[in-house]
Amino acid sequence: MVPLWWSILLGVALFVIGAGGVLLRRNILIVLMSLELLLNSVNINFIAFGQYYDDFRGQIFAIFVIAITAAEVAVALGILVALVRNKSTLKVDDVTIMKG
């Protein structure tokens, strides 16, 4: 069995990498992938704590997060396709101006 602190360390490392990608990158696709990395790091911690406390609720909550994330990715990729067709760019700075 893997010690709890290894799982927490992995989750924190992935969270920091994902947060860095969200805050530092200007490509919307990279930001979306970094956001997915953030959510998966949270899932690792849910499962690790569920295993440590011998409770299945951590795994159930991780499954719900995965389902919600799948829906979020589907919507975000649809928006990205529409954005590329209209603006021909994926830069965050070029998309911030909203016109009616």
Curated annotation (Swiss-Prot):
Cellular-component GO terms for this entry: NADH dehydrogenase complex; plasma membrane
Entry's localization field: Cell inner membrane
EC number, as in UniProt: 7.1.1.-
Predominant location: membrane
Keywords linked to the UniProt accession: Cell inner membrane, Cell membrane, Membrane, NAD, Plasmid, Quinone, Translocase, Transmembrane, Transmembrane helix, Transport, Ubiquinone
Membrane-crossing residue ranges in chain numbering: 4-24, 28-48, 60-80
Keyword Translocase: yes
Coiled coil, from the record: none
GO molecular function, one term: NADH:ubiquinone reductase (non-electrogenic) activity
GO BP term, example: ATP synthesis coupled electron transport
Topology within the bilayer: Multi-pass membrane protein
Catalysed reactions listed for this entry: a quinone + NADH + 5 H(+)(in) = a quinol + NAD(+) + 4 H(+)(out)
Annotated function: NDH-1 shuttles electrons from NADH, via FMN and iron-sulfur (Fe-S) centers, to quinones in the respiratory chain. The immediate electron acceptor for the enzyme in this species is believed to be ubiquinone. Couples the redox reaction to proton translocation (for every two electrons transferred, four hydrogen ions are translocated across the cytoplasmic membrane), and thus conserves the redox energy in a proton gradient.
Family affiliation: Belongs to the complex I subunit 4L family.
Subunit structure: NDH-1 is composed of 14 different subunits. Subunits NuoA, H, J, K, L, M, N constitute the membrane sector of the complex.
Protein's recorded name: NADH-quinone oxidoreductase subunit K 2
Naturally occurring in which organism (per UniProt): Rhizobium meliloti (strain 1021)
